[in-house]
Amino acid sequence: MLDIKLIRKAPEECETRLRKKDPSISLLPILNLDKEVRQLKTDSESLQSQKKLLSRQIHQTKARNEDASDMIGEVERISQELTRLEALLEEKDAALQNLLVRLPNYPDEDVPISPDKTGNRVIKSVGSPSTFSFPPKHHLELNQKLQILDFKLPGKTSGSGWPAYKNRGVLLEWALLTYLLQKQQSHGFQLWLPPLLVKREILFGSGQIPKFDGQYYRVEDGDQSLYLIPTAEVVLNGFHSQEIFNEKDLPIYYAACTPCFRREAGAAGAHERGLVRVHQFHKVEMFAFTTPEQADQAYEKMLSIVEEILTELKLPYRLSLLSTGDMSFTASKTIDAEVWLPGQKSYYEVSSISQCTDFQSRRSETRYKDSQGKMHFVHTLNGSGLATPRLFVAILENNQQEDGSVIIPEVLRPYLGNQEVLSAQE
């Protein structure tokens, strides 16, 4: 959520910055409503003062045994007008807040301006796309012999886009997750297995709604709706909603391992079959609460961890600075880490690392008190560390052998009984 004071102070500058993300944005309706709200507050405060003054005069008049009926009538008239003004103020302020919460975060100055992902800028490449002495197979073809994934049986129970891991696939997935969690812990992150269902206001706090209302799985619990999390970012941000940190306790680093649930997976094309785009997947999420001054260092820390993981897994990858048209609603800056998938003949995102400035903390009311006792909103950052489906695919497709077997990355072998190869099964 953006600071209305800044919009009020520099409306043209704010609108210019916001239009880099969405050219249709106009701040005029917000400015007009803000003006009405402030005038209504002024009028209401003026009437409250008049009412208090008249009440004192009535008390004094009655103490002198004089007639106060005219003043009493005026107080009643003012009370009625106050009731009307307060109802109108509530209505106008709700309309103002409804517009404010739909504004995205401002993009940083160094973010490329583009309406879509075609404007993303590759800022680093490590390794070259894998080459083979044989025609490489898609992970679905590899699975025909490996037998580590199943799409048919879960399709019966849940529909398309809900894969199941089985046998050695389960062990490889958990080896990957254990490795990722231990990596986060080694860098000072507190580990969490948080709830998977959250209240609506927690989704609001992280910026998922109202902008993207209807895109999340929801369950009804009596008179309350709970939502399946699309990312652990939601719940980690919500842990400290309406709380105040001491500056000396920042930064705080969290990492959570959760299933994530997303409805939009059904839009995948034929080339994105299998694990590339699904409704449910595991992800280790990094999250940080910082002061504004600590945010850049936290960002570099998250990015370096992602690079360390991809380097240890020996996967070809690149980093892309997302354009204004491809970055998220909440982010001021996002770098995607993308791995090469031979089966898709393309790079695919496995991690997004985002700075969100004070956008989420204003919505969640998460603040900190500095050494002078002054209150500030914290800055929040998040990053995938990492999402496993495409990482799983990358491991299979980049390490495949001609016979359909797969070489297990060295860093994962200790979690798999030092097994070196996933052998193909005839």
From Swiss-Prot:
Record protein name field: Serine--tRNA ligase
GO BP annotations listed: selenocysteine biosynthetic process; seryl-tRNA aminoacylation
Subunit structure: Homodimer. The tRNA molecule binds across the dimer.
Gene3D superfamilies xrefs: Bira Bifunctional Protein, Domain 2, Serine-tRNA synthetase, tRNA binding domain
Coiled-coil features, chain-numbered ranges: none
Native organism: Chlamydia felis (strain Fe/C-56) (Chlamydophila felis)
Chain's role: Catalyzes the attachment of serine to tRNA(Ser). Is also able to aminoacylate tRNA(Sec) with serine, to form the misacylated tRNA L-seryl-tRNA(Sec), which will be further converted into selenocysteinyl-tRNA(Sec).
Localization annotation: Cytoplasm
Pathway the protein takes part in: Aminoacyl-tRNA biosynthesis; selenocysteinyl-tRNA(Sec) biosynthesis; L-seryl-tRNA(Sec) from L-serine and tRNA(Sec): step 1/1
MF terms (GO), sorted A to Z: ATP binding; serine-tRNA ligase activity
Major subcellular site: cytoplasm
Family assignment from sequence similarity: Belongs to the class-II aminoacyl-tRNA synthetase family. Type-1 seryl-tRNA synthetase subfamily.
UniProt keyword terms in alphabetical order: Aminoacyl-tRNA synthetase, ATP-binding, Cytoplasm, Ligase, Nucleotide-binding, Protein biosynthesis
CC annotations in GO: cytoplasm
Class of this enzyme: ligase
Residues binding ATP: 262-264, 278, 349-352
Residues holding L-serine: 231-233, 285, 384
UniProt free text on domains: Consists of two distinct domains, a catalytic core and a N-terminal extension that is involved in tRNA binding.
Catalytic activity: tRNA(Ser) + L-serine + ATP = L-seryl-tRNA(Ser) + AMP + diphosphate + H(+); tRNA(Sec) + L-serine + ATP = L-seryl-tRNA(Sec) + AMP + diphosphate + H(+)
